[in-house]
Structures are given as C-alpha cells and as structure tokens.
Amino acid sequence: MAPIDFRNKINWHRRFRSPQGSKSEHEILRIFESDRGRIINSPAIRRLQQKTQVFPLERNAAVRTRLTHSMEVQQVGRYIAKEILSRLKEQRLLETYGLDELTGPFESIVEMACLMHDIGNPPFGHFGEAAINDWFKQRLFPLDAASQPQSDDRCIVRDLRLREGEEPLNDLRRKVRQDLCQFEGNAQGIRLVHSLMRMNLTWAQVGCILKYTRPAWWMGEPPASHSYLMKKPGYYLSEEAYIERLRKELSLTPHGRFPLTWIMEAADDISYCVADLEDAVEKRIFSVEELYQHLYDAWGTHEKGSLFSQVVENAWDKSRSNTLSRSTEDQFFMYLRVNTLNKLVPYSAARFIDNLPAIFSGDFNHALLEDDSSFSQLLELYKNVAIRHVFSHPDVEQLELQGYRVISGLLDIYQPLLKLSVEEFTELVETDLMKRLPIETRLLHKLSTRHRLAYVEAVSKIDRTTAQWPVMEYYYRCRLIQDYISGMTDLYAWDEYRRLMAVE
C-alpha cells in the first residue's frame, strides 16, 4: 500500500487553463478560494432554494429547502474536517501525511463538496429520479438488451435495438439503454459541474463530490470489495472520459473513492437525520412529545448512561425545564442537534483516522457512520423513525405521487422531440425552425440555451459517417431532455406542467 501523502490527492490543477508550476501554500489556498467563488455564485446553488428537502412545494419558510439543508451539511463537514486536522496535529501527523501546508484546502474542499452535494437532484427528490428512470425503462427496456439480439426486443427506438452481426455496436446500444435508465442525482451533479456549467473546478474539488464509483451503464452485481461504494450510479457515459482523467489526476483505483468524500457523506448523514424530524414537527405531522415517544420506543433496551440517554433523553429533560424561556420544540431540537453533533462528529473523525490507510487508497467499503457501534445505532434510530412516521404520512405520500406525475407528464410532453429521426432532429437544431414540425420547433425553443449548447458540443465530436452516430446522437438527445427537466425547481416543474397541460 502506498504511503499516505495528501499532496498526491489534493490536486489543485484544473481541466482547462490550469495554473502551472509549483505554488506556495498561499497560492494554493487562493486556487481553492476561486473554487469557492465559482460554486457559491453558480445558478445550480441558487436553484436549491426552490427545491425542498422532504416536503415538495412547501410555502412555510421554516421548513428546509435543499439550500438550507446544504448549508447545514457544509457547517457539519467543516466541523468534522477541523476535528480530524486537530487530532492529526495532536498526534504530530500533519507533516507525515503531507497536510502541514494543506489544512486550508482540506477544509475548503470538504465544505464546498457539502454545499454542492445535492445540486444534481431533480424536482421532487427521489420520486423525481424514479419518474425519470421508469419513463425511460418503459421505452428502452434495458433488460431486453442484456441478452443476445432477439425478435421480441421491446425497445421503441429503432437505432437502439440490438441487431444480429452488429457487435460491438450492440455493446454500445446496451450501454446507452442502461445508462439512460439510471438517472441519479449524484451522477447528474458531476454532469452539471463538468458538461453543463463548465465550472472548471480543481480535480480535488470534483473528486470530493464523486460519491459513488459505479458507472451508470454497469449491469450486474458490483464486486464485493466495493459493493458499498458502487451501490448507486456515480457518473454517466457522457462523462466517462472526464472521470477517467479524474482518476488519473487523483491516483484513484478503478472503483475507488476520493478520501475527503467520506467526510462529506458523514456530514450529510448527520444533518438530514435530525433535520427531517424537526421539519416534520414544524409541519405538525407529530408533536415534539410524540416524536420523543417514537424515539424512545424505537431505541429498544434502555440503560442508564446509554448514548440515547446522553443525547435524546438529555435534550428532552433540558427542553422540559424551559430554563431559556423558549418553546419546548425550539429547545428540544437545539439540544438534540448539539448533543448529536457533539457525539457523532468526534466519532466520525476517529473513524476517518482509524481507517485512514483504506480511506486514502479509496477502497474503504463503508460509510464512516456505518458499523455496529451505538453511534451508528443512533443515526439509524433517527432514520427509522422518519421512515415510519414521516415519509409514510399521507400528506407526504400524496405530494410524492403528485411529483411523480408531474415529472412523468413533462417527459410525455417533450416526447415528440425524442420521436424525431436523427436527420429531422439534427436539421431542427441547426435551423431552429421547421414549418412541417410546429410542435417540435416550439418544444425545442423551450429548452434552455445552456442545455442545447451542451448537446450541440457533444454531438459535434461524433463522426457522422460512423455506425455509432445515430446511437450516440440519440443518447445525447435523451440527456438533453433529462438535463432540462431535472434542472427545474419544484415550483417551476409544477407550473410548467400545469401550463403545458392547459389546466390553468
């Protein structure tokens, strides 16, 4: 195993117009400050303020949006990063691990990854993801492509059907069909940063948001050694070359993860578990008294001095004493949040350091807060209560079903663009107006300029004389539609659906 030297991981070079030569500590910090500016000022971050965390289309400003959640994750990520660096300093290991002049970039990379971690999420969260994937599966039938060419291939797209004697073109068709049916917020985040917004972030900063390492076209089970790291798609076929370059620049193993990504993941886990419960109380799904009882009942055996006693019971007792003359709700969540952070942040830092060799190599096949400890049990307690009493609430389920219908409906509306032949769509894009295609012309005009330019750039790199041309053109056309719809905010998607369905 290679020695731990973070100077080989915190790569401050960029894909385009990268600074050259050696840099001082201050100059490297300025490079990552530039990353911060690019991220904070990006439209993708601003859109998070109109995407909700649990309750779509929520008008109550006290309930978290994706932006306020991401800011909370950012703060927790910073806390964990500082705790790790402080412990390494106490152990006199900063210089040994090549971090003595990289503490600032270490913190900044984690913070900005936390702020960005949700930028690829579509409207209506996981139900938006499910709607996109189900819609494409019902048209591309990727499982039909898993075998050899067959007469009953149900794929409705002629250029994507398998054909006898056309290997390896059939392999490309298989990859494309699988890839398009695996929309995932984390993979879309990578696509946003590189292909759509062209943010040109440092390799280290992008590496930190590559949460999962499975390509979206992967079929079959992942290797057991990386089953956790590959449990979801992490990037698309459209970003394959970029990710290959990223792995080279960051010295990552084929399915390995960037070391600081574990910190971002832990910060997200800690933040959303408490936040979802607080939002549920704000929405009057249950009272704070009922929440405490749910937590108490779900914990199981209660022993004096247990972690539950130190965190949840302590918060409950302090909130009942009302020493701060504030509402019981406010006090309970303040103490619960503080107690949770004070236990889980140091534990996350300790887990990171204790497993640093495997984490540095990128092959630690677990989350930091995924083990048989009471700390992991506490996190699971919060998650399970939310699953049982929040996400299954009729109001939440109704909103999720509405969101699923909105996204499915928008895909139906834009389907005429996907039904055009490669020749027709190419002509439409190049001329921007085709009298014989009035509906398709108007639908194309509704797509954002950024997404259309990304499509044009991608297809311009394909040789139109090859057999791959119609397959890859259709792939990028589907990406164009997915990019546009997934980039909408909850409210915009809702309003756009109502407008185009003429229900207003």
From Swiss-Prot:
What are the GO BP annotations of this UniProt entry? dGTP catabolic process
Which GO terms fall under molecular function for this chain's record? dGTPase activity; magnesium ion binding
What CDD domains would the database entry show? Answer: HDc (cd00077)
- E.C. number: 3.1.5.1
Which UniProt keyword terms apply here?
A: Hydrolase, Magnesium
Q: Which SUPFAM superfamilies match?
A: HD-domain/PDEase-like
Where in the numbering of this chain does the HD domain appear?
Answer: 66-273
* Catalytic activity, reaction form: dGTP + H2O = 2'-deoxyguanosine + triphosphate + H(+)
Q: What does this protein do?
A: dGTPase preferentially hydrolyzes dGTP over the other canonical NTPs.
Record's HAMAP family?
dGTPase_type1
Q: What is this protein called?
A: Deoxyguanosinetriphosphate triphosphohydrolase
Q: Which organism is it from?
A: Enterobacter sp. (strain 638)
Origin organism lineage: Bacteria, Pseudomonadati, Pseudomonadota, Gammaproteobacteria, Enterobacterales
